[in-house]
Design a protein with these regions (language model features):
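Short, glycine-/small-residue-rich phosphate/pyrophosphate-handling segment
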Residues: 108-156
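Short, basic/glycine-rich phosphate-binding loops at helix/coil junctions
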Residues: 43-51, 127-131, 166
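Glycine-rich phosphate/pyrophosphate-binding loop and the adjoining helix
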Residues: 137-141, 145-194
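Short, structured loop/turn "capping" segments at alpha-beta junctions
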Residues: 103-108, 160-164
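N-terminal beta1-alpha1-beta2 submodule of the flavodoxin-like/Rossmannoid cofactor-binding fold
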Residues: 1-105, 182-194
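Active-site donor-binding loop signature of nucleotide-sugar glycosyltransferases
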Residues: 39, 131, 169-171
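Short histidine/acidic/glycine/proline-rich micro-motifs that form metal-
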Residues: 10-13, 84, 133-137, 171-174
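A structural motif corresponding to the C-terminal end of an alpha-helix
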Residues: 75, 81, 121-122, 156-162
Length: 194
């Protein structure tokens, strides 16, 4: 399997960064080809420019995003590692989805019906790895926007039998060192079996 691991957290000493390293190493250790994208380290710009928006339906990624678009085309598994902030994806991760998964990369419009036709049918796995400051109950009440974005909206564009996984640590701010270590271990084991 070819896995693209997309990571969003500004701090190199964060639990999220540990999860990113763990995910990439576990996948590689299981024999998968792995490419990691550290959006903050790359200086990825979250906001779509006016020029990008004007050319949105020209079926081509902006030149600065060509490498990211090619990696999406290359991958058959997408893994997202990030902290949940304000009950959703960090702005940089949401920006990556909006700027990279554009017409010509993620989908195109049928010429006659103008309905969305997927260009991500090669994606067989979507995995989300995240931490929440809130409890499971609070996240459920707020409808878990990040999970819905990745496992529903993105999943709809993927292969018909695309499998998904959601690996989450809730109440991370009050979790113990042992709970965080156990979560890292569970992520490692789960991805080693992907």
């Amino acid at each position: 399997m070819r896995a693209l691991v997309v990571f969003a957290h500004p701090s190199g000493d964060s639990l999220s960064h540990t999860l990113f390293r763990t995910a990439t190493m576990a996948l590689a250790g299981a024999g998968h080809e792995v490419v990691g994208l550290d959006l903050y380290a790359e200086g990825f710009r979250a906001a779509m420019s006016a020029d990008e928006r004007r050319s949105y339906h020209l079926d081509d990624a902006a030149a600065e995003l060509a490498r990211h678009a090619e990696l999406v085309r290359w991958a058959d598994a997408l893994v997202f590692v990030y902290p949940t902030w304000w009950m959703g994806l960090p702005a940089i991760m949401k920006g990556w989805l909006e700027r990279v998964l554009v017409p010509g990369v993620a989908f195109h419009l049928h010429p006659r019906t103008q309905k969305v036709v997927s260009d991500l049918r090669h994606i067989r796995r979507v995995v989300g790895i995240t931490t929440y400051g809130s409890s499971w109950t609070q996240v459920k009440v707020m409808h878990d926007a990040g999970r819905r974005t990745l496992l529903r909206a993105l999943r709809m564009l993927c292969a018909r039998r695309c499998r998904t996984a959601w690996l989450a640590l809730y109440s991370v701010d009050t979790s113990t060192d042992d709970q965080r270590a156990a979560f890292v271990t569970s992520v490692e084991r789960r991805l080693a079996r992907l």
